[in-house]
């Protein structure tokens, strides 16, 4: 009887720990691309309360570094928790609070070697229903496997200014 109880407790604990990084399909991220595709979906929502911030947090190493463009002339470094808090604060913007926010990947380039990966994305971001056109940007993601699961180790971001395009170089043709 004690063994059965221990087994049930262990199974419950294991499923609780692993559920932190399940994609919408209900399976672990088998590829780094699945993780990156899902983070854009995960942060897009009608309001902050409908975002599963715990799920977003589970996508990052605890020590991950997030560097985002926070104004025209400034980038800010965040921890994963700071990144999430910045997003929660953004969702308090009255227009975002009423209409929601959406991000989507326009293009993606991936390099994987064993348990490490680099992914570059060109994305669009918009306040849903806004008269302003969507903003485009570039995210450069580094990932590594941890306990068999892909996790984000770092991301750095740059906004593509209106009317600008990426450099006309082979590395940016994706």
Kindly label every feature range from the protein language model:
Residues 39, 56, 64, 119, ...:
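Hydrophobic pocket/interface hotspot
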Residues 136-164:
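Short beta-strand edge/turn micro-motifs at domain boundaries
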Residues 4-13:
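Sec-dependent N-terminal signal peptides
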Residues 40-45, 61, 65, 88, ...:
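Sec-exported extracytoplasmic/periplasmic mature domains
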Residues 47-75:
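N-terminal, post-signal-peptide region of Sec/Tat-exported proteins
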